């Protein structure tokens, strides 16, 4: 068992599950989506991206690209939420965009997990 792969896999899967936790729920109900969970998803996604930087393979390049997409979309979602929220309220349009951006990041994270599992299954024991 390779400890580096275990740690990287842990953060890749944790990034996806935190992102799903933020994304899931009624897109019109702000109470269903925690800004702290969005912040945690951003931090864990950035950690997962940094852990992927050491992989010099073609698969590593695709994994880094998918992580960068997720990072960019989550940071954009948090930026929108921060800029447009006033007195703990946010317009439904901006909130819908925030949820949509996190959904795009979730797709990038799912892609990353599928590729990571595929790469693990193809590697020699």
Please describe what each predicted stretch is:
Residues 48, 64-82:
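Hydrophobic alpha-helical membrane segments
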């Amino acid at each position: 068992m390779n400890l580096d792969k275990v740690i990287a896999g842990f953060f890749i899967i944790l990034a996806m599950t935190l992102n799903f936790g933020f994304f899931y729920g009624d897109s019109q109900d702000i109470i269903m989506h925690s800004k702290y969970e969005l912040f945690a998803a951003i931090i864990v996604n950035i950690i997962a991206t940094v852990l992927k930087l050491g992989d010099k393979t073609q698969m590593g390049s695709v994994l880094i690209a998918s992580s960068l997409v997720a990072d960019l979309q989550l940071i954009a979602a948090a930026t929108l939420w921060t800029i447009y929220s006033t007195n703990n309220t946010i317009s439904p349009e901006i909130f819908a965009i925030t949820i949509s951006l996190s959904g795009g990041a979730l797709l990038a994270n799912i892609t990353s997990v599928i590729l990571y599992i595929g790469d693990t299954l193809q590697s020699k024991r």
